[in-house]
Amino acid sequence: FYTQGDYGIWQCSRPCHHETYDNRKIVEKMVEAQGYTVAADGTLLAPQRAALKMTVPSELVPHCPKCGAPMTMNLRADSTFVEDDGWHKAASRYDDFIRRHQGMKVLFLELGVGYNTPGIIKYPFWQMTAGNPKAVYACINYRDAACPTELQNQAICIEGDFERL
């Protein structure tokens, strides 16, 4: 559930409508235009002998198909965040899961969540853990793995790089 957005989709920067668009193919073209090769498994291969171009050709810059404004990442940064149909369906599934598992053993796993918008993930996880003695809050974060002292008996906080843990 991409409650905070998804780097893999674009939305109109205005936004003039509430649809999002998969950006994988165009991002691959942007990466290739800089000199990389994208392997069949998605691995990026840097050029062996040439320097990276570090620019994207203007014809690859995405524009809204409805109004022509530049497209932007679908990230909850301000009031322009688009909650599309897929977002609402995922939110409904999440709410249903939370409702069906109240009072049961639940792991609230928080991976790399910061304090940009703590009211979306972090604080609700803390509240749901505090309200359920069978719940566990687990936080893995590069530099800021913490929880309120009231949750310390129900929490696991690990600081470190995901790739090394």
Per-segment meaning from a language model:
Residues 1-165:
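Conserved catalytic alpha/beta core of Sir2/sirtuin-type deacylases, generalized to analogous enzyme cores
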